[in-house]
């Protein structure tokens, strides 16, 4: 090694060569990184934040296993994004379970903050959130532990991109099995996931979290063989078929909460609006098990026969069907939730045993005017969640007692299958 005096400085050419080598390598590395970043920038852009706040829970309905859940999709970009197509895939096999596009997708979208009665379309503005309501029917015998989603969306420049969020786990917890909430019939299970202001789509944000208590809520409306819902003045609650009918406990349970201090309007047409939290009217909440509470709402004033902390037996009369709270007509609201608060819980599925299916109203506007369609007449072999607007008949009091005795024997042999489950709600029983 040798050194040279240059301008008064000693230059170690070995070190100089090493420094130059490192500089060249650094320049090449930076150039490659810039080139790579330029290439990536052509493929990368901001998109949606996708969240599934409540894991899908399976339930038997219409003879098939179904799932009901929501995708919360928030636009964090500075431009409008358009939802174009949503595919739901089985997490294990990759099989396409559902493919929503065009009007079918638009009908499932609710833009947070938009008027409930106005069409929201599929365009999500910057900072806005869309909720996509999803109902799936699985293939016979199919069991899923996870779901995957593929979302095609349009960018402001007209290009289309595909978003593939992380897989969503499917809960394996079984639905709670309830006894009949009423006797006899016919009773119409009024609910429909497509109604903009129906239980299925009414969210509440309290305590810093958005929840959907009425995800599986059912409103039971009494009718007769001709499809009428009133035997006298249609504006008088007491003339409604089903008014004052006994409401039955669906399980051996502890009474978690009771409210019985609300009056009823004497006019259906002029029933006043109620403040948030009083829409359920008079109600009884039964604790079925860990994180599972059944709500029986809109009960007649003075009819509740139980108090908080008491224990009730399956089939025991707990109150009477009424017209208290926010409702467009006398009915029994039933849902199951994961806590004992009417609005601060997540709705979970439940099934009802010992009911016979008489038919269905394909257009709920026909209820009160015409008989139902009878093409779905059957008696389920297993407890089911009542499907949309089906008409059912429950056992008579004598049949209820015999059914309860038989179910105690069956349940004693299958207690290892796991705890029960339920769900919450609070909305009108008519299409909004």
Report the location of each language-model feature:
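A structural signal for short beta-strand/turn segments enriched in small hydrophobics and glycine
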Residues: 253-255, 309-321
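Terminal connector regions
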Residues: 137-177
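Acidic, glycine-rich catalytic/binding loops that coordinate metals and/or anionic ligands
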Residues: 172-191, 198-202, 231, 274-278, ...
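Asparagine-centered strand-capping/turn motif at beta-strand->loop junctions
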Residues: 73-80
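Short histidine-centered loop motifs in beta-beta connectors
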Residues: 292-315
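Intrinsically disordered, low-complexity Pro/Gly/Ser/Thr-rich segments with frequent PxxP/GP/PP motifs
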Residues: 98-141
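Zn2+-dependent peptidoglycan hydrolase active-site motif and core
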Residues: 242, 254-300
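Short, solvent-exposed loop/turn segments enriched in Ser/Thr/Gly
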Residues: 53, 63-70
